[in-house]
Amino acid sequence: MKNNKKLRKWLDDFKLDHPLVIAGPCSAETEAQMMSIANELKGSDVSIFRAGIWKPRTRPGMFEGVGSIGLKWLQKVKKETGLLTATEVANANHVKLAIEHDVDVLWIGARSTVSPFIVQEIADALEGTDKIVLIKNPVNPDLALWYGGIERLYSSDIKKLGVIHRGFSTYSKSKFRNNPEWQIPIELQNKYPDLPLICDPSHICGRRDLLHEVSQISLDLNFDGLMIESHLSLIHISEPTRQDRI
């Protein structure tokens, strides 16, 4: 895959005078929750409403998402607010259901990016799609894996591509939930300067007080947008141990 100015076309088509903003809850929990958040966001700079329908968890027994019923809530968000919609997909069935419910943007999560098998399955299911497809960096700082995921999607004739930087896992003590390791997305940006690059400060920070700092750094580095988790009331989200997140 070579850099191509056409890679930016889908982003340019938004005709924005500010960075692209994708926002919404980490997880879809109820229809009322989704609609409340979407209605708060619709008058802002947010262009795309995000919500996790299926949630990959480290251990069984944790909340793994509401499942396909949440796709109907995304449809309602789109119909009533005019916002485009986005969700994470991790297999071919997720892709099929998301497309059936007219989700506009599909992203591949960091835990999926680490597996060429998973990325290829998703790429095959998306072959030739006109949906916007975003791929997060792998959880470990392996730029080759990220390149490989991008190339697999591009080889499946997916034209509306972008990447999301969400930081990297580390055993070292850090103020960040996932270390940004800015040199890695910068290297990707140097290789593909026209591939839209979005920062996910929520996953990098893991706490609200760092969001502005990380968001500003990404924009100073010429990132094209932000993906931010947004909640109306943190005390009511399904993961009370992570109420410091936004």
Predicted regions span which residues?
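Short, acidic/polar
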Residues: 31-40, 90-96, 210-215
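Alpha-helix-loop-beta-strand connector modules within alpha/beta enzyme cores
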Residues: 64-86, 125-132, 184-194, 242
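Single conserved hydrophobic/aromatic residue that forms the stacking wall/gate
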Residues: 235-246
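Active-site mouth loops of central-metabolism enzymes
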Residues: 20-34, 60-62, 85-88, 110, ...
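N-terminal amphipathic alpha-helix/helix-capping segment at the start of soluble metabolic enzymes
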Residues: 1-22
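Catalytic alpha/beta core domains of metabolic enzymes, predominantly
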Residues: 118-233
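Hydrophobic faces of well-ordered beta-strands that scaffold small-molecule active sites
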Residues: 20-24, 47-51, 85-87, 106-108, ...
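N-terminal active-site wall of soluble small-molecule enzyme domains
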Residues: 51, 55-107, 116-118
